A protein has these predicted regions:
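Regular, well-ordered alpha-helical segments
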Residues: 18, 26-29, 45, 49-52
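Aliphatic-rich helix starts adjacent to a transmembrane/signal segment
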Residues: 23-40
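N-terminal single-pass transmembrane signal-anchor helix
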Residues: 1-24
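Alpha-helical interaction segments
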Residues: 14-17, 22, 39-41, 59, ...
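Conserved catalytic core of two-component sensor histidine kinases
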Residues: 10, 37, 44
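Periplasmic/extracellular, small/polar-rich flexible segments of pilin-like filament-forming proteins
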Residues: 45-111
Length: 111
């Protein structure tokens, strides 16, 4: 193998490695988005469970921890009780570096 062939092989491996690193970052971001959505669904179930037990929606995350809710590390959950019968939940990264997702109890949708 000549020096030129070796340099070509090293260049190709470098290009493939840079593509792979970008893809891994994209997959990690998608996985974290899925974690935030999952946390919202679980928190909504915990809110309903709390309501079933205490006949009101809680204002704090500490309250839904009592009924079994556990969030993913690195996900910040915000609870906003908009009326006695409705609430919204927002999941985001604490540093705000990614999108946030919001669950609305009136529609049951995550946006």
């Amino acid at each position: 193998m000549t020096l030129l062939e070796l340099l070509v092989v090293v260049a190709v491996v470098g290009i493939l490695a840079s593509i792979a690193i970008q893809q891994v970052s994209l997959y990690r971001a998608r996985a974290f988005d899925a974690s935030m959505r999952s946390d919202l669904k679980n928190a909504a179930l915990a809110m309903e469970s709390y309501y079933g037990e205490f006949l009101e929606y809680p204002n704090t995350q500490a309250a839904i921890l009592l009924v079994g809710y556990r969030n993913t590390s690195g996900v910040s959950l915000t609870i906003n009780v908009t009326s006695p019968s409705t609430f919204t939940l927002t999941a985001a990264r604490p540093n705000g570096s990614q999108l946030s997702f919001t669950y609305d109890s009136t529609t049951g949708l995550i946006n």
